[in-house]
Amino acid sequence: MGLFGKTQEKPPKELVNEWSLKIRKEMRVVDRQIRDIQREEEKVKRSVKDAAKKGQKDVCVVLAKEMIRSRKAVSKLYASKAHMNSVLMGMKNQLAVLRVAGSLQKSTEVMKAMQSLVKIPEIQATMRELSKEMMKAGIIEEMLEDTFESMDDQEEMEEEAEMEIDRILFEITAGALGKAPSKVTDALPEPEPSGAMAASEDEEEEEEALEAMQSRLATLRS
C-alpha cells in the first residue's frame, strides 16, 4: 500500500519481466495441448485403418472429420505460439527502450499479437488479463469489445472439407479405402457376414469407442 491507501505501482522493468514469464508459461501449456491432440490423432489413425478393413466407410468418414478438426486446432495453436513469440520480442524491445528512455512505449506489434491471442480459447483468460495490464501501462491501446466477444467461433465442416476427408482416408489406408475417390459417398465392398449377434455386439462396442474418442478429442480442442 502507498499513500492514501493506493497500491504502489510496480516498476516497468518488473512488469515486463512478469509478462514475459506468463507468456512463456502459456507457451508450455500450448505445447502440452499440441502433444496431447497429436497423440490422440495417432489413435484415430489406427481406428480408421481398423474400420477400413471392416468396410465401415461411415465410421472412417466420421473419424476423418475429427482429424480435420484436430489438425485445424493444432494449426491455430502453432499460430498462437508465433504470436506469443512476437509478444516476447516486443517485451525485449521494451526493456531496451526502458534503459534509454526511462519509460515503456506503445507497440503496434505487441498490440496486433495480443488482439490475436485474446481470441484463442485455450489461453484467453491469461491473455485478457495481460492485455488489461499492458493497456494500463500504455504499451497497447484499448481493444474493441468485439475482439473479446468473438471467441466463440465454432467452425462447421464445410463442403470443401470433403476433398480433405478423401485425402486423409486415402493416405491413412494406403489407398485401400477406394482409389482416390472423388466423393466420400463412394461405397466400399461389403464385409463378409460372420454371425448376426456377434456383429451387432461388435458394432455397439465400436460405436461406444468412437463416441469416447470423439469426446476426448473435443475435450482436448476446447
From Swiss-Prot:
Residues 22-54, 141-222 form a coiled coil. One of its GO terms (cellular component) is multivesicular body membrane. It is a lipid-anchor. One of its GO terms (biological process) is viral budding from plasma membrane. Pfam families: Snf7 (PF03357). The record marks 216 as: Interaction with STAMBP. Residues 59-64, 168-169 are annotated as: Important for autoinhibitory function. Residues 2-113 are annotated as: Intramolecular interaction with C-terminus. InterPro entries: Snf7_fam. Keywords: Cell cycle, Cell division, Coiled coil, Cytoplasm, Endosome, Isopeptide bond, Lipoprotein, Membrane, Myristate, Phosphoprotein, Protein transport, Transport, Ubl conjugation. Residues 200-210 have a biased composition (Acidic residues). Residues 180-222 are annotated as: Disordered. A motif (MIT-interacting motif) lies at residues 201-211. Residues 151-222 are annotated as: Interaction with VPS4A. The record marks 48 as: Important for autoinhibitory function. Residues 196-222, 203-207, 221-222 are annotated as: Interaction with STAMBP. A lipid is attached at residue 2 (N-myristoyl glycine). Probable core component of the endosomal sorting required for transport complex III (ESCRT-III) which is involved in multivesicular bodies (MVBs) formation and sorting of endosomal cargo proteins into MVBs. MVBs contain intraluminal vesicles (ILVs) that are generated by invagination and scission from the limiting membrane of the endosome and mostly are delivered to lysosomes enabling degradation of membrane proteins, such as stimulated growth factor receptors, lysosomal enzymes and lipids. The MVB pathway appears to require the sequential function of ESCRT-O, -I,-II and -III complexes. PANTHER family: CHARGED MULTIVESICULAR BODY PROTEIN. Probable core component of the endosomal sorting required for transport complex III (ESCRT-III). ESCRT-III components are thought to multimerize to form a flat lattice on the perimeter membrane of the endosome. Several assembly forms of ESCRT-III may exist that interact and act sequentially. Forms a metastable monomer in solution; its core structure (without part of the putative autoinhibitory C-terminal acidic region) oligomerizes into a flat lattice via two different dimerization interfaces. This is Charged multivesicular body protein 3. It comes from Pongo abelii.
